[in-house]
Amino acid sequence: MSHKIQGGSVVEMQGDEMTRIIWELIKEKLIFPYVDLDLHSYDLSIENRDATNDQVTKDAAEAIKKYNVGVKCATITPDEKRVEEFKLKQMWKSPNGTIRNILGGTVFREAIICKNIPRLVSGWVKPIIIGRHAYGDQYRATDFVVPGPGKVEICYTPSDGSPKTVYLVHNFTESGGVAMGMFNQDKSIEDFAHSSFQMALSKNWPLYLSTKNTILKKYDGRFKDIFQEIYDKQYKSQFEAQNIWYEHRLIDDMVAQAMKSEGGFIWACKNYDGDVQSDSVAQGYGSLGMMTSVLVCPDGKTVEAEAAHGTVTRHYRMYQKGQETSTNPIASIFAWTRGLAHRAKLDNNKELSFFAKALEEVCIETIEAGFMTKDLAACIKGLPNVQRSDYLNTFEFMDKLGENLQLKLAQAKL
């Protein structure tokens, strides 16, 4: 390349353990040699989050709000063991949750597909992108054990002082049982709808919302009605212009349809459905190491991309002992490419758009040419049958990607 591409403003969040090492390699070998970025870096390592009382996470989220593009390395969400290991002041919350709460928006997961990596669902030749509405429902519910016979009622008391409304949930006559009250908010459902419609337009794929509105006529019916109203008023003409569509589906029909389909659609799920189906779909494609995660805000303008996997602690322990590792960097690389592609779209930067696409193609072409990490070799041959000659180690694979990217960009005469 005769010159560096001017990339614009990007917020970068460093992470923990093996993914932190890979993150630095990605910047050094694949990004910085070709792209000149106005980079705003935040160290989200567990040590720095502890040192700053997690203020660094909030600062990073505010920076994403300002610059509209964030790329994030995987981070540790501490449990009791981690609190002990790092002598933390407290059990800090998930950085992803903190960022999502500040930005709003919906998390969309998408599989990265290579022809030579077998899929459990062989018919899925295109990704299925799942958008999970990560607010409310069972996750904010009040549930309790009903100790014995009696009535369970739900009461709504209007804040304007008008009469309250009481609904009978169940009259327990012979014994107790269990009960739950859950909720969602129109504003949150509206934001979920906008993020989903924006994602469909950007991918140029159809969108399906799944609910069980035949049973939960009012509750799930509200999701269905809000989506339909927003679609008809604000998105229908854009969808038709792009020759894509939006449809509501019953969750059981949708699950069956997804299994039979070839992929190539966005699936908007309520909170619990999204929790379950995103893992089920991820497994169907074969590997979490090949799964991207993108937070899309309702404005369609603000995006944060990351890998859908963790910090790969087991490999980091090996790395610390000086042992060889073969850690898959693909999802972390795609966090960068998705972030840069969005930056390119916002700025109408054709060179940057080409670069992001070229780097994604290099990743897939390299694997399809037989150069891969151990986890992918295991997908093909089965772990007990994998020999050392079947895969590259962490650093060899990054070098191979670097070589192939250099070749591709030279051929393109950028």
From Swiss-Prot:
Entries under Pfam families matching the protein: Iso_dh
Annotated InterPro entries: IsoCit/isopropylmalate_DH_CS, Isocitrate_DH_NADP, IsoPropMal-DH-like_dom
Residue numbers carrying Phosphoserine: 389
UniProt name for this protein: Isocitrate dehydrogenase [NADP] cytoplasmic
Provenance organism: Ovis aries (Sheep)
GO cellular component: cytosol; mitochondrion; peroxisome
Superkingdom: Eukaryota
Chief localisation class: cytoplasm
Function: Catalyzes the NADP(+)-dependent oxidative decarboxylation of isocitrate (D-threo-isocitrate) to 2-ketoglutarate (2-oxoglutarate), which is required by other enzymes such as the phytanoyl-CoA dioxygenase. Plays a critical role in the generation of NADPH, an important cofactor in many biosynthesis pathways. May act as a corneal epithelial crystallin and may be involved in maintaining corneal epithelial transparency.
Compartments (UniProt record): Cytoplasm, Cytosol
Reactions mediated catalytically: D-threo-isocitrate + NADP(+) = 2-oxoglutarate + CO2 + NADPH
Residue list for modification N6-succinyllysine: 126, 400
PROSITE patterns in alphabetical order: IDH_IMDH (PS00470)
UniProt record, GO biological process: 2-oxoglutarate metabolic process; glyoxylate cycle; isocitrate metabolic process; NADP metabolic process; tricarboxylic acid cycle
Entry PTM: Acetylation at Lys-374 dramatically reduces catalytic activity.
Enzyme Commission number(s) of this protein: 1.1.1.42
Binding positions for Mn(2+) per the UniProt entry: 252, 275, 279
Major enzyme class: oxidoreductase
GTP-binding keyword on record: no
GO molecular function: isocitrate dehydrogenase (NADP+) activity; magnesium ion binding; NAD binding
Cofactor: Mg(2+); Mn(2+)
Residues marked Critical for catalysis (site): 139, 212
Subunit and interaction comment: Homodimer.
Modified residues (Phosphotyrosine): 42
